[in-house]
């Protein structure tokens, strides 16, 4: 009996130690700014500072010259600025539109010369001189919060799509990890989004050609429009599409997985020159899918 009691005591002590260790490990997994939120502005300032300093020494020449519109159009697209499927207050939607217009002024008509690199974050750091950002709802640590300057991913998404349809080489791009609401356009190409966060995540492309390229952005009441222009006409066009779109359930979470494919088309003959898979994208879906969508179990 004494031996049994001793074993039970040892087991209880072991469980207490184990639980304490798990709690400690859980605390270790938390970022310092999660434990002390008041440190977040300092951390953001530090990351932006170090990121900008790092760009001065990374051997890239960043585009910073603007000019009159170049003669030849390489590609174009448009995107609706208001997503009626998001369920978000229309005030925040209008705030996002204002933020997009401010951010676009930092890079509209930027020239990307041969050998230069375009950086989204490098350019938007000067946005304050064009106006004050407004609040937009974003996802931070699993919670939706209002943050000034939010919604700029709408612009980086459009630019990334344009870059994929051009001869420019994407050298940095980060997809969103979570999709919280369906696209307003059911025919929209999936997996081409590009999240940005100054100091952490950027969208960069390099001009490895001998031609000059330029970004042109403009707006109407409903849409944001984008074009890639050049000083020389191109004999080819690039078409982006999806293949192997599927939905899977893993660890009680639903993911969308899709291949992003690019076809190169000869403009003179309208014949396909080549077709290649650029990458595969996987994103967690947190909204309810339509009942007719098949979900694979894994």
Each language-model region and where it sits:
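Short, Lys/Arg-enriched N-terminal segments with co-localized hydrophobic residues
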Residues: 7-26
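Well-ordered beta-sheet/strand-loop patches within structured domains
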Residues: 27-298
């Amino acid at each position: 009996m004494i031996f049994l009691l001793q074993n039970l005591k040892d087991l209880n002590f072991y469980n207490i130690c184990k639980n304490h260790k798990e709690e400690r490990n859980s605390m270790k997994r938390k970022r310092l700014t999660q434990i002390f939120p008041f440190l977040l502005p300092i951390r953001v300032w530090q990351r932006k500072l170090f990121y900008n300093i790092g760009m001065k020494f990374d051997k890239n020449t960043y585009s910073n010259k603007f000019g009159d519109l170049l003669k030849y159009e390489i590609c174009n697209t448009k995107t609706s600025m208001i997503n009626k499927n998001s369920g978000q207050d229309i005030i925040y939607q209008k705030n996002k539109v204002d933020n997009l217009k401010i951010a676009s002024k930092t890079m509209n008509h930027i020239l990307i010369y041969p050998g230069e690199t375009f950086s989204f974050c490098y350019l938007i750091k000067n946005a304050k001189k064009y106006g004050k950002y407004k609040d937009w709802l974003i996802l931070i640590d699993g919670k939706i919060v209002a943050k000034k300057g939010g919604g700029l991913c709408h612009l980086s998404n459009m630019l990334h799509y344009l870059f994929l349809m051009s001869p420019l080489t994407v050298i940095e791009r980060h997809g969103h990890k979570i999709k919280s609401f369906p696209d307003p356009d059911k025919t929209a190409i999936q997996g081409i989004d590009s999240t940005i966060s100054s100091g952490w995540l950027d969208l960069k492309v390099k001009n490895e050609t001998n031609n000059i390229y330029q970004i042109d952005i403009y707006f109407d009441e409903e849409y944001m429009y984008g074009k890639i222009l050049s000083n020389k006409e191109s004999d080819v066009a690039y078409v982006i599409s999806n293949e192997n779109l599927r939905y899977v359930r893993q660890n009680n979470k639903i993911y969308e997985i899709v291949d992003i494919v690019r076809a190169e088309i000869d403009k003179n003959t309208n014949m396909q020159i080549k077709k290649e898979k650029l990458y595969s994208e996987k994103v967690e879906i947190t909204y309810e899918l339509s009942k007719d969508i098949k979900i694979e179990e894994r």
